[in-house]
Amino acid sequence: MVPAAGQLALLALGILVAVCQALENSTSPLSDSPVAAAVVSHFNKCPDSHTQYCFHGTCRFLVQEEKPACVCHSGYVGVRCEHADLLAVVAASQKKQAITALVVVSIVALAVLIITCVLIHCCQVRKHCEWCRALVCRHEKPSALLKGRTACCHSETVV
């Protein structure tokens, strides 16, 4: 005999009620202590047999699956951290290259600034320096000498 649709619906409803009652909270005491459940971790240390399991990472033992897993170091991917992550390597390389370029440019700019300050100081305050005179007086126009003015270098005046 084939049951009617109403009977099937009642049967399904009965099963659903039975499952809900089974899953419902009860006032019976817990069999395990709640502290022990909170302390249990999903990972344990890998046994000695798996110390070399991960190529570029740290080994952890999955408690539920009872097998080792790897936490890869930066720049490596794969189940056992066996593959280099090229995108991470390129990004790190570009960052290092940019920092190196910035340091080099800063050092060169600082050196140019220091040399410029020394030259200005020497040529403004101490025009009697031999190398300053050679640098400054070399570019002096003879028109200043012809008009009877004092030249940039103290030793050259027109009478």
From Swiss-Prot:
One cellular component term (GO) for this entry is: extracellular space
Which SUPFAM superfamilies does the record cross-reference, listed alphabetically? EGF/Laminin
Give the signal peptide range. Answer: 1-23
* Sample GO molecular function, one term: receptor ligand activity
Lipid-bearing positions (S-palmitoyl cysteine):
152-153
Give the superkingdom in one word: Eukaryota
The protein's recorded glycosylation sites are 25
Which Gene Ontology BP terms does the record give?
angiogenesis; cell surface receptor signaling pathway; epidermal growth factor receptor signaling pathway; ERBB2-EGFR signaling pathway; hepatocyte proliferation; mammary gland alveolus development; negative regulation of apoptotic process; positive regulation of cell division
Q: Which InterPro entries match?
A: EGF-like_dom (IPR000742)
In this chain the EGF-like domain maps to: 42-82
Q: Which residues lie on this side of the membrane: Extracellular?
A: 24-97
**S-adenosyl-L-methionine as UniProt keyword:** no
User: Keyword Transmembrane, does the record have it?
Assistant: yes
Which residue ranges are assigned to the Cytoplasmic compartment in the record's topology? 124-159
Q: List the disulfide bonds.
A: 46-59, 54-70, 72-81
How is the subunit organization of this protein annotated in UniProt? Interacts with the PDZ domains of MAGI3, SDCBP and SNTA1. The interaction with SDCBP, is required for the targeting to the cell surface. In the endoplasmic reticulum, in its immature form (i.e. with a prosegment and lacking full N-glycosylation), interacts with CNIH. In the Golgi apparatus, may form a complex with CNIH and GORASP2. Interacts (via cytoplasmic C-terminal domain) with NKD2.
What is the stated purpose of this protein?
A: TGF alpha is a mitogenic polypeptide that is able to bind to the EGF receptor/EGFR and to act synergistically with TGF beta to promote anchorage-independent cell proliferation in soft agar.
Xref: PANTHER family: PROTRANSFORMING GROWTH FACTOR ALPHA, TRANSFORMING GROWTH FACTOR ALPHA
Protein name, as recorded: Protransforming growth factor alpha
Q: Say which species the protein is native to.
A: Rattus norvegicus (Rat)
